Amino acid sequence: MGLRNFFDRIEPQFLKGGRYEKFFPVYEMVESFIYTPKTVTTAAPHARSYIDMKRIMTYVVIATIPCILFGMYNTGLQTNMAIAEYGASGWRAAIIEMLGVGFDPNNPFANIMHGLLYFLPIYIVTLVAGGIFEVIFAVVRGHEVNEGFLVTSMLYTLIVPATTPLWQVALGIIFGVVIGKEVFGGTGKNFLNPALVGRAFLYFAYPAYMSGESVWTPVDGFSGATALAISASDGHATLPERGIEWMDAFIGTIQGSFGETSTLAAMIGLAFLLIVKIANWRLIVGCMAGMIAFSSLLNWIGSDSNPMFAMPWYWHFVLGGYAFGLAFMVTEPVSASHTNMGRYIYGALIGFMVVMIRVINPAFPEGMMLAILFGNVFAPLIDYFVVQANIKRRAKRNV
């Protein structure tokens, strides 16, 4: 009651004519984060729904929790296993020793705590750097700060390596927010996924920090390829020899970015999004169908020089960022197709493209990021042709 009174008391200072009128978006951001927005429709029709933008974004953040928790655990696990051979150094190791947690990879709490020390700084920098530019654009344009940035910041954090320098983290999210969203008008008007735009910028601007064998496990001197990179060079059949079974990849105890290693965690999040009706199942069906069909075709064609031709669809499903991208990027409602038939086509295009990039392009074993951005670009065109086809069909029916 006291907090509500506080907001009501200072609100006139931020309204039109008030002393801090220009900073109303900042006030509205904090107030609507704590309380349900008071905005209602002023004229008919009055559509009632149990869900609003704030709740949608909250649900998406909730859906990422399994990926966050397992991402911290796996980052700590991979780090602690490497420390056993290469030793510990840096301020994080000092904090771990001060807390008496230790570096035992068999201790889940030690793994989570160590992973938290990598996840938290990246997330804080992402939230602050991107949030500053969100507020700047909101103040200049005179509109509210949308909750969509909470989702963008979380997804962005989950798709970067744990070793990413913090200044690069800030640069990437700023690029994603400004170029991927705000230049098109802000949340709801962007046709590209801002988190992926930021990640793509870092990949092409600083490839040595975003790929390779030394960026996944934050231990000095350690080098280890991802399962997808091993498959690209030696074939997926060699993965068990490297200690990577299919179930390891499904659970996520392999090298990779924070949130992308665990297919299980991503599927739990996707199931939640389907239950609350935020994710559209047509996008998922299309993406899975495109991936399964094209990977099966390449399996049938075969290749003596490219081992990726032999990778079956169920390995594509658990390796790289496919599952995470399917759960949180493909189903993102703003940048995806909006027609029902278009959603099948859009999903199938992404499923086709991710296999195409992984198999045909030898320089880039992970293809989900580029495949989704490619799909984002074509989504409006797909919807256009679907709508035009429907118009022509209805016109012929009425002749």
Regions found by a protein language model. Name each.
Residues 1-119, 123:
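N-terminal signal-anchor module of multipass membrane proteins
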Residues 112-126, 163-172, 253-263, 309-322:
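Structural signature of hydrophobic alpha-helical transmembrane segments
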Residues 122-136, 173-181:
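Central hydrophobic cores of alpha-helical transmembrane segments in multi-pass inner-membrane proteins
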Residues 146-218:
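A generic, well-ordered mixed alpha/beta core segment in the N-terminal half of proteins
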Residues 152-162, 179, 267-273, 324-330:
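Generic transmembrane alpha-helix motif of multi-pass integral membrane proteins
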Residues 170, 191-195, 314-321, 343, ...:
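Loop-to-transmembrane alpha-helix initiation sites
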Residues 185-267:
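Long hydrophobic alpha-helical segments that form multi-pass transmembrane helix bundles
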Residues 284-340:
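A beta-strand-loop signature enriched in Asp, Gly, Thr, and Trp
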